[in-house]
Amino acid sequence: MLLALFQTKADQPNIIYILADDLGWGDLGCYGQKTLKTPNLDRLAKEGMRFTRHYAGSTVCAPSRCVLMTGLHTGHARIRGNGRSQLQSNDITFAKLLQQHGYQTGCFGKWGIGSPPPLNDPYIHGFKEFYGYINMYHAHNYYPEFLIHNGNKVKLRNELFNNWREERTGLQYEGSGVAKITKDYAPKLIADRLISYIHKAASNKSKPFFVYYALNIPHANNEAGREKRIGNDGMRVPDWGSYANLDIPDQEKGFARMIDYIDKDVGRILSVLNELNIEDNTIVMFSSDNGPHQEGGHKMEFFNSNGPLRGMKRDLYEGGLRVPFLVRWPGKVPAKKVSNQISGFQDIF
């Protein structure tokens, strides 16, 4: 898909690819969700194309993201599970390809493609700017003690329970665990940094930009789901917003609020594109890395996250693999269009 964009330099649009983490096919209003409100994502579908038969690269995080980045089907990709396999420095990713064609490249959020260092550094794989989590276990924690900015640790005001530091040894687990002091909500910091980057990149009129916004929500903090000191709540958020007064479990309020955060951040992105007068020359894509989860105290069926599909994350059924996919490119992608064409992560490259 992206290869088709490189006909002439004048044809090069900006590209924003947004990847939610463990968001189900049925979690968006435009895919039939009745309780959770997603007006900005529904707008994306209305102003572009909604795909009904789009498939993630795998049923879990790391291999799915590997397929997305390399364009290789899971049978050919290096990473086939959430283990210690990783991309090699000479592997081709679409970020590298875009960089070679003059794009400014930025990745914000959860990289999560292999471990340990140094080969899991997004810089090696085509991203000049990075802010977020390198390791997927670190990304379980919404309130980490640090994030990574271009290879350097940025200290936050959060503090883990001591036992998590002692129990989670090894580079692949660094920073993971459960926070007892929760002052900085990492998804918000990452979204703010993303918006700032779009402003900066758009000011360079001579180069288009590619942004990979890899969220770590609504994925659960799996570790927090078994931490009694915080009520086994793996879906903690700063506040529950409009869901605060609902008579539902706290974990479901947290999940609902995460969907709300995602939707609002998509709205922020669309607004800044309009503000900068670049929306007509920017492709915006939205998807999820696999089917919905049932972890951290959240129950997948509570909001019917897989819609009519069978199965969930980790299952080799439709519910584990089929994911939302929305594409908006004003004037190029028809508005209000629904595609039943089978497609997958390997097709993005």
Regions found by a protein language model. Give the residues of each.
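Formylglycine-dependent sulfatase
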Residues: 6-349
